[in-house]
From Swiss-Prot:
Molecular functions (GO terms): SUMO polymer binding; zinc ion binding
Superkingdom classification of source: Eukaryota
Phosphoserine found at: 627, 694
Name recorded for this polypeptide: Sine oculis-binding protein homolog
Subunit relationships: Interacts (via SIM domains) with SUMO1 and SUMO2.
Zinc fingers (FCS-type) by residue: 142-180, 216-256
GO terms under biological process: cochlea development; cognition; inner ear morphogenesis; locomotory behavior; sensory perception of sound
Key word Metal-binding present: yes
Chain intervals with Basic and acidic residues compositional bias: 1-14
Protein family: Belongs to the SOBP family.
């Protein structure tokens, strides 16, 4: 906006032009200005300095020198009104120049009125609402046209309406609002500062002459955290460093992060030299020591060569610390012995077998498998030793080495170059291939060994192999650069003898073969870390077997199990022979479904058939009332009735992909057929749903009666399609065998009257609305029920109250087979949700549990 107003172009022109940065900047500036104004007003209310978002990067903490030049980082609101010892002109200007890059801070109009150098500044900036120079017109423009100024408060360019003389500068404001806000903010700041009295606590601020006029509380100054670069209005900034390099952090977290960052950077800066010096052969220092101190802040100031000389070689130190072995470590080069400060090396336990620090023992030349060093003397205190091809090795070390070899064969693979000389630094081979020139022997020891030494597992004691600390590196031929662990004291795994992996104790050091890839401060643990790999363990989750698709003709679609039945089942015969006028298809389906029981489940289907015979007239599905076949089939069924009774015979339409099956528990009970008043009417309502309803079965009482005793077998006849023949209601009269429960005799209550009461409470699942049966479905249901010989109607089904209970579990105390036709809601106008109640065979409730669960599952699937 400022530039546009200066140029005299209306914003429309600029927008009309191809959109460029100015347009974006304008939008951003407007939003920033709005945010700044709002925030500054809020801050002003609470006595805080105004914040200029534009200067977020530049609101600096304390001044600290950069390139020897005292940088003055002036906070957004640094008050220049206080008379201060003047800084050199160039220093103040330099601070402003530095800040200008970030829409730097400049004092309001004072910048144009008086050069920055002429203003009174303490060595440390004072809070003053500063205007970023980019938005300040050149002094010439300001002088020429005082009409337009940049408001010292809202930072917008506008006509000068108010001005406030603040000591050395005059602040101009574009409106009374800005003027009042600025005055209020200054007043609150000064008041807070006076109350706090902490102005003197900041030594950086030299308040030589404190004028009470507009002295600002310094600790309310907008400070920017040196780490997170956020402006925190906290009085507890943490100072770090001294003098001009003092940094301020808003929290201990930022301070710690800063320290870590510095540590990391310095470590990286020093690390390459350290690694190179130790990894690349510095011949002169090789003999002087094989250990290097861990990189610490103190060591950064020490030349690496000195550090190398000072660092005790961990192996020698370990050897000396170890009882018998170390005493004999005379072969160690004098520098090594001198350097060995046992205190610095955490030798875990002096148990470890100092593999011949003793001069008497010849150094183990790490040769290819052929050259296996003689067994080395074992000090009396050493742990149980395992004799390997290389000689005795402490058992724990041997075990670890074997594990390591198995885990990291590639690293162990490199052919070890044996150093015949006892001084060869095999302890150092741990940093094997790190840029070591293939040509020269290398002194890896300094960095590698100390690094790995302390990491040794407590039971791994730094063994000092003769080849380890004092061996002159010159004797160690450099491994090929590619060899992973060229200097490992044992041959590559491929060359290893078949016997137990003869890994010398050196593996303690050898394990850190990864060290070259890791900066020295990282400690490589020489013992294998077992990382558990998750192995999926199958957890069996029982999933009910539900057949949503139409079962084959030979199977009933109970969803529980397909019950293939011999086609010759009497129920099938009954279904077809039952004189009912069922379409052959219906009868066929009924026969197939009702006859679906294999020997295992035949009891279900057969018991179903007798029960249905008892119910024959009630269930008009495909059975004729007096179907002799049904009656004849009863004896066969009777035998089977007592078979598996948990099965559920589903008389639902098999072709329905959706599962309309309601699973009823097979209950061992005698079918008690009773008539329920109005049952006929109910049944008739939807009886001839598709016109497929067979003529009313006048009487199946005969079949029903024999079925009664046989009905003891558990049968779950589930008819999900609501098929009821009007005649069915009339038809079956309760067999004399079955005592009718106190239900009206008009309707056959297949001993379900009591059940009905229970079912009413339990809410039988009559999915009248959920089960949509096509005409074929209804036909099939009719056929199936006829085959089942449903003699009795299920009062529960007939009870409208029961029809509501779609999800109720069937708590059938004694009732067994329930042919539950599920009405298909208004799929066809003729199809009214008439429920065919089928007699329930009263059965022992002991079988209730699994079928109830299955039934619940089926109900749930149905209602889905």
């Amino acid at each position: 906006m400022a530039e546009m107003e200066k140029e005299g172009r209306p914003p429309e022109n600029k927008r009309s032009r191809k959109p460029a940065h100015p347009v974006k900047r304008e939008i951003n500036e407007e939003m920033k200005n709005f945010a700044e104004n709002t925030m500054n007003e809020l801050l002003g209310w609470y006595g805080y300095d105004k914040v200029e978002l534009k200067d977020g990067e530049d609101i600096e903490f304390r001044s600290y020198t950069t390139d020897g030049e005292s940088r003055q980082h002036i906070s957004v609101l640094k008050e220049n009104s206080l008379p201060k010892p003047k800084l050199p002109e160039d220093s103040v200007i330099s601070s402003y120049n530095i800040s200008t890059g970030y829409s730097g801070l400049a004092t309001g109009n004072g910048l144009s009125d008086s050069p920055a150098g002429s203003k009174d500044h303490g060595n440390v900036p004072i809070i003053v609402p500063l205007i970023p120079p980019p938005f300040i017109k050149p002094p010439a423009e300001d002088d020429v046209s005082n009409v337009q100024i940049m408001c010292a408060w809202c930072q917008k360019v506008g006509i000068k309406r108010y001005s406030l003389s603040m000591g050395s500068e005059v602040k101009s404001f574009c409106s009374e609002k800005c003027f009042a806000a600025c005055r209020r903010a200054y007043f609150k700041r000064n008041k807070a500062r006076d109350e706090d009295g902490r102005a003197e606590t900041f030594p950086q601020q030299h308040y030589a002459k404190e004028t009470p006029r507009l002295a600002f509380k310094n600790n309310c100054e907008l400070l920017v955290c040196d780490w997170c670069k956020h402006i925190r209005h906290t009085k507890e900034y943490l100072d770090f460093g001294d003098g001009e390099r003092r940094l301020q952090f808003c929290s201990a977290k930022c301070l710690n992060q800063y320290k870590m960052d510095i540590f990391y950077k310095e470590t990286q800066a020093n690390l390459p030299a350290g690694l190179c010096s130790t990894l690349h052969p510095h011949m002169e220092s090789k003999a002087e020591g094989t250990g290097v101190q861990l990189l610490t802040p103190d060591s950064w100031n020490i030349p690496l060569t000195d550090a190398r000389r000072k660092a005790p070689s961990p192996v020698t130190a370990a050897g000396q610390s170890q009882g018998p072995g170390p005493s004999s470590s005379t072969t160690v080069s004098p520098s090594d012995t001198a350097n060995c400060s046992v205190t610095k090396i955490p030798t875990p336990v002096p148990k470890s077998l100092p593999i011949s620090e003793t001069p008497s023992i010849p150094p183990v030349s790490v040769q290819p498998p052929a050259s296996i060093g003689p067994p080395l003397g074992v000090p009396p205190r050493s742990p149980p030793m395992v004799m390997t091809n290389r000689g005795p090795v402490p058992l724990p070390i041997f075990m670890e080495q074997q594990i390591i070899q198995q885990i990291r064969p590639p690293f162990i693979r490199g052919p070890p170059h044996h150093a015949s000389n006892p001084n060869s630094p095999l302890s150092n081979p741990m940093l094997p291939g790190i840029g070591a020139p293939p040509g020269g022997p290398r002194n890896l020891g300094p960095t590698s060994s100390p690094m790995h030494r302390p990491m040794l597992s407590p039971h791994i004691h730094p063994p000092s192999t003769p080849t380890m600390p004092g061996n002159p590196p010159g004797l160690l031929p450099p491994p090929p650069p590619g060899a992973p662990l060229p200097s490992l004291p044992f041959p590559p795994v491929s060359m290893m003898p078949n016997g137990p992996m003869p890994v010398p104790q050196m593996m303690n050091f050898g394990l850190p073969s990864l060290a070259p890839l890791v900066p020295p401060p990282t400690l490589l643990v020489p013992y294998p870390v077992i990382v558990p790999l998750p192995v999926p363990i199958p957890i069996p989750i029982p999933i009910p077997h539900v057949n949503d698709s139409k079962p084959p003709n030979g199977f009933s679609s109970n969803g529980e199990s397909f019950v293939p039945s011999a086609p010759g089942d009497s129920s099938a015969a009954g279904g077809k022979a039952g004189g009912r006028s069922l379409s052959p298809r219906d009868s066929k389906q009924g026969s197939s479904k009702s006859a679906d029981s294999p020997p295992g489940s035949s009891g279900q289907a057969l018991s179903l058939a007798p029960a249905e015979r008892g119910r024959g007239e009630v269930v008009d599905l495909t059975r004729r009332a007096g179907s002799p076949a049904g009656a004849g089939g009863q004896p066969g069924f009777a035998g089977v009735l007592h078979g598996p009774q948990d099965g559920v015979i589903d008389l639902t339409v098999g072709h329905r992909a959706r599962l309309h099956n309601v699973i009823h528990r097979a209950l061992h009970a005698h079918v008690k057929a009773e008539r329920e008043p109005g049952a006929a009417e109910r049944r008739t309502c939807g009886g001839c749903r598709d016109g497929h309803c067979s003529p009313p079965a006048a009487g199946d009482p005969g079949p029903g009666a024999p079925a009664g005793p046989e009905a003891a077998a558990a049968c779950n006849v589930i008819v999900n399609g609501t098929r009821s023949a009007p005649a069915e209601a009339k038809g079956a009269e309760p067999p004399p065998e079955q005592p009718p429960p106190p239900a009206p005799p008009k309707k056959l209550l297949s001993s379900e009257e009591p059940v009905v009461n229970e079912l009413e409470s339990v809410k039988e699942n009559n999915c009248a609305s959920n089960c949509h049966l096509d005409g074929e479905a209804t036909k099939k249901l009719m056929g199936e029920e006829a085959l089942a010989g449903g003699d009795k109607s299920d009062p529960n089904l007939n009870n409208p109250a029961d029809e509501d209970h779609a999800y109720a579990l069937r708590m059938l105390p004694k009732t067994g087979c329930v042919i539950q036709p599920v009405p298909k809601p208004a799929e066809k106008a003729a199809m009214t949700p008439c429920v065919i109640s089928s007699p329930m065979l009263s059965a022992g409730p002991e079988d209730l549990e699994p079928p109830l669960k299955r039934r619940c599952l089926r109900i749930r699937n149905q209602n889905k």
